[in-house]
Design a protein with these regions (language model features):
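Mature N-terminal segment immediately following signal peptide/propeptide cleavage
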Residues: 41-68
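Predominantly a core beta-strand signature of beta-propeller blades
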Residues: 47-50, 95-99, 142, 160-163, ...
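Blade/loop signatures of beta-propeller domains
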Residues: 26-46, 150
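Hydrophobic beta-strand positions that form the internal "hydrophobic ladder"
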Residues: 69-70, 120, 184, 228, ...
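Residue-level detector of Asp-centered blade-edge/turn motifs that repeat once per structural unit
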Residues: 64-65, 115-116, 179-180, 223-224, ...
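A flexible loop/linker signature enriched in serine peptidases of the S9 family
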Residues: 53-56, 73-83, 102-108, 123-152, ...
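Short loop/turn segments that connect beta-strands within beta-propeller blades
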Residues: 88-91, 156-160, 200-204, 264-268, ...
């Protein structure tokens, strides 16, 4: 698995505004839909279309009207993730050209689109430095960086009128918005541990929802705003606790047995959904409010690098595998009507580890 900072796996391309992206789009023609799916994937995915071409593109999330996707990308000439938007459908059926909406400085992650006020949301390190933050030290194994310079910002949909939303010390990222636009859920180390918080859309009325030692993060609201799905790993033994605290003090975590959890919007009713001991992440609700789609490497216990999409009932029953490609698939999100699915995948890449966004019709 690659770097997954926020719900993350990516980095982004900058270029001059979106010229670099346009060039990347022109490098590759539309692939035939049938070539983008394995035979097993045809049960739930049809008429798949590749949306981005080249670099690393991930965390693609629909606007509330499903007409746009906001995502992060890193590519040739750009060392750090930046945030872009792209039209889902174009009149000429050609790939749309992504538009840069973040500052082009520092590293950005975890973007989302407000439902009604023409603004976007993302986290960035640019206030601390215009340069990329340092890469993590992998001498202690595979770790994720938790940059304490991440702050949450809002901006107009074109990237102008940038406003700081959170200025608490520590890591502040992984933010998503309720469909009524009134509340934000996010992950922060402001109290010394990686916990989930909510706040109003203006940054006020901050409430801590999780309190158990360990990583609680990657939260997403249910469609009715009454529940939150998230990923968590809570160390149990003295050795695990010591290792977790030592790494966190260095701005790192070691992703291991991440499980999917659900809680009510006020933090009550926490319950574990998956129990497979694998790395499960990027959970998102199906519009029916009963099922959760997520990414996991449970089918690759030996190497742990092959992540696929699964769907499961909130009570942990009825789990079904959705993707079968022999590499990474992650960051799934349904359209509001549940008829289409966007996700990030290594399939059809022209370079090793290339990650692109794909859109498919969802079949029950």
């Amino acid at each position: 698995m690659r770097r997954i900072e926020c719900v993350a796996i990516v980095a982004t391309f900058l270029g001059l505004n979106y010229v670099g992206v346009a060039m990347a789009q022109e490098k590759k023609p539309d692939a035939k839909p049938a070539s983008l799916l394995t035979p097993e994937e045809g049960k739930h995915l049809q008429n798949v279309r590749q949306l981005t071409f080249g670099g690393q593109n991930a965390e693609g999330y629909f606007s509330i009207d499903d007409k746009q996707i906001i995502f992060q990308h890193q590519g040739e000439g750009v060392p750090c993730d930046q945030i872009y938007t792209i039209d889902v459908d174009t009149t000429d059926r050609k790939p749309a050209v992504p538009k840069l909406v973040s500052t082009g400085k520092g590293r950005t992650t975890c973007s989302y689109i407000f439902p009604s006020n023409g603004r976007i949301l993302f986290s960035s390190t640019h206030a601390a430095s215009a340069e990329c933050p340092p890469k993590p030290d992998y001498s202690r194994g595979y770790v994720w960086p938790i940059y304490d310079t991440y702050r949450i910002y809002t901006a107009k949909s074109d990237g102008s009128d940038l406003k700081l939303l959170t200025d608490a010390p520590g890591y502040n990222a992984e933010a998503t918005i309720t469909r009524d636009g009134k509340h934000i859920v996010f992950t922060s180390t402001r109290n010394g541990d990686l916990d989930i918080y909510t706040m109003d859309a203006d940054g006020k009325n901050v409430k801590q929802l999780t309190h158990e030692l360990g990583y609680d993060g990657g939260p997403f609201w249910s469609y009715d705003g009454k529940k939150i799905v998230y990923r968590a790993e809570h160390p149990k033994t003295d050795t695990e606790i010591a290792d977790y605290k030592d790494l966190l003090a260095k701005g790192l975590i070691r992703p291991g047995n991440l499980e999917i959890w659900v809680m009510n919007a006020d933090g009550s009713g926490k319950h574990q959904v998956t129990h497979n001991g694998a790395a499960n992440f990027a959970p998102f609700w199906h519009p029916d409010g009963k099922r959760i789609i997520f990414a996991s490497n449970m089918a690759d216990p030996k190497n742990g690098r092959d992540f696929d999409l699964y769907i499961i009932n909130e009570d942990g029953t009825g789990q079904e595998r959705i993707t079968f490609h022999p590499d990474f698939d992650g960051f799934p999100m349904f359209t509001s009507d549940g008829k289409r699915l966007v996700w990030a995948s290594n399939r059809n890449g022209t370079q090793p580890h290339e990650t692109n966004l794909f859109l498919a019709e969802w079949v029950e």
